[in-house]
Design a protein with these regions (language model features):
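N-terminal low-complexity, Pro/Thr/Ser-rich intrinsically disordered segments
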Residues: 1-13
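Conserved catalytic/binding loops enriched for acidic/polar residues
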Residues: 10, 15-16, 70-74
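Amphipathic alpha-helical packing elements
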Residues: 17-58
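Compact alpha-helical subdomains of small soluble proteins
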Residues: 41-83
């Protein structure tokens, strides 16, 4: 699995590992899940960040139907820590 945070796609994340991350790291981790499915970001900074990744292939404006149950649960958990 490509990216800086492959664990967000492979397994359920834990509270303790998310507590150790900064807001920016949490944001990148959450959006990396979408990027792996080729999501085309509307925010310039996210598009710029992921466009620098050799594995990123933007091709979808909606990837919700591509997300696994693990990814969906991790996105919701990460959002709780981004507040």
């Amino acid at each position: 699995v490509p990216g800086r945070y492959p664990q967000a796609t492979i397994r359920l994340l834990t509270v303790s590992e998310l507590q150790a991350l900064s807001m920016q790291e949490l944001r990148i981790m959450r959006n990396e899940i979408y990027a792996r499915h080729g999501y085309i970001f509307k925010k310039k900074e996210l598009m710029s960040h992921f466009s620098d990744q050799p594995w990123y292939k933007p091709c979808n404006t909606n990837v919700d139907h591509l997300l696994t149950d693990i990814e969906k649960k991790n996105i919701e958990l990460i959002k709780q820590f981004e507040r």
